[in-house]
Amino acid sequence: ITQARLDGSYVMDTGSINFGIESRSMESTSLQSLTRHTMGNWGIENPGELPAGSLTPLDLASEFSDFNTEGMFSQGFTGSVAQIGAFAAQEYGFDFLANNPFATNRTIEEDITAVYFELDLSGELNGMEYNLLAGVRYENTDVTSIANISLPSGIAWEGNNDFNVRFGSDMEDVEVESSYDHVLPALDFDIEVVENMIARFSYSKTIARPTYNNLSAAATVSPQSGPTILTDSITATASSGNPSLIPLESDNLDLSFEYYFDETSYVSVGFYDKRVKNFIGNEQVEENIFGLRDVTNGPRAEAARAELEARGIPINDTSLFNMVAAMENGIEYDSLTDEQFEQQFDVLPNSEDPLITFINSKPVNNKAANIYGFELAAQHFFGDSGFGVLANYTTVQGDIGFDNDANPSITQFALVGLSDTANLILMYEKDALQARIAYNWRDKFLDTTSQYINEPGYTEDYSQIDFNVSYDITEDLTVSFEGINITDENIRRHGRTSAMLWKLDELGARYALGVRYKF
């Protein structure tokens, strides 16, 4: 990041006029490479074939003692990838972790020029004290997305339902430029309408720029999960960025009333409304990418299926792969085991195979939404005792939710991360000792609309108790002790219904002892 900024101010009796200019340049580079060696099939079929100590049995269910894990797949193995890889390299005669070139080299350049003007005033209006902060900011942004990518040479069929994207040595540069500008006004006004009661009004227009991942000019492909000749339900997928994305724009309105019934005690109520446009949604397009071809749906796959039918052999992923490999290499179908076919042969696409139709998901600015709610808060200290209490509750509503009863094949846009929250804090602050214990709660919320393709993911309602105690030994030296989630609460995530478990998080309690010294 390279940044230059110049600010100025003209001071008056009732306030000031502030102004400035800014230039900011940012560059983000992402490098990615993949080395893959397929050793055996899914899971561990014959762990005894590996050197002693390479694998350790793992009871997965026992790792989640706070949950009912009945019916959960419980037995697994864990081990050292480096140790197993080194053994396999020596056993089968290949180099472990070959030095492949970077398959993807992506750079995003963002150049921002801004100028602002601000008026800061304080005074009285009909005997009521007020504060006014009003201004406007203009920003111009130029975006350049550069991708230097290794072109895929083909998708190899390495086993029944095992596929691997292989890359050639050719690299290709893709560069896309875009630009946008915004005028961003802002107004904050508060006035003491009666003694100890303050009314606040705020309006602003803000932006949130797309993430760099969404601005990539390159596409990433993922092979299908099985032979497409056997079913129409299996598809290959791809994802790509969109360098022409523009920021989210939000018109924000906030109203609140605060009543101070003591020097450190108050109650407040507020309303907020945010009108947001240019939300990023995913658009799915059926298209071929990089000229890649489907080895599982061409003449060789058709001939293998016909041969299996003629012999009366059940047709599935494994038998089809074995027959294609046998016919292509001139060996008998029954001469090798399934494992030997997988270990000895890969089937590569050729010009007679059909082009793969990928379902390419790319981000686009295509949605708008409204977010609104209320905020209630209160704080009170009990005389000079040092004891106090703070409580707040925030409601969040949105006009676009996820329809769990909709057709799963339809991509839905919905606002994520919206839920009511509440906090209750008991405090002690006197002399050199400060202590707080807090109860924090968050209601159930939608956290993703694409947990798997078009499936939603919900985080269930959750609460935890935290505490913090600190003591000022001197003005400069402070010791502290804190505990987070001291009652050992856990997080559970599910899909369209609570029965569709996605994820369990056993968080546990965390404690920290700290020392801080100010120089």
Model feature map: region roles:
Residues M12-T14, I21-T29, V136-T144, Y203-R209, ...:
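Transmembrane beta-strands of outer-membrane beta-barrel pores
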Residues D273-R275, V285, G291-S450, T487:
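Gram-negative outer-membrane beta-barrel transporters
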Residues N100, T104, I108-E110, S178, ...:
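Outer-membrane beta-barrel signature, preferentially recognizing the C-terminal barrel domain
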Residues I1, G43-F102, N160-E172, I229-S240, ...:
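Flexible glycine-rich, low-complexity coil/linker segments exposed to the extracellular/periplasmic environment
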Residues V11-T14, G123-N126, V183, I191-E195, ...:
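Outer-membrane beta-barrel strand-turn architecture
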Residues N41-I44, K277, W441-T449, S470-F519:
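C-terminal beta-signal and adjacent terminal beta-strands/loops
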Residues G15-I17, N126-Y130, N196-A199, T264-V267, ...:
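Repeated loop/turn-to-beta-strand initiation elements of outer-membrane beta-barrel proteins
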Residues L6-Y10, V115-L121, L187-I191, L245, ...:
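Residues on the lipid-exposed face of transmembrane beta-strands in outer-membrane beta-barrel proteins
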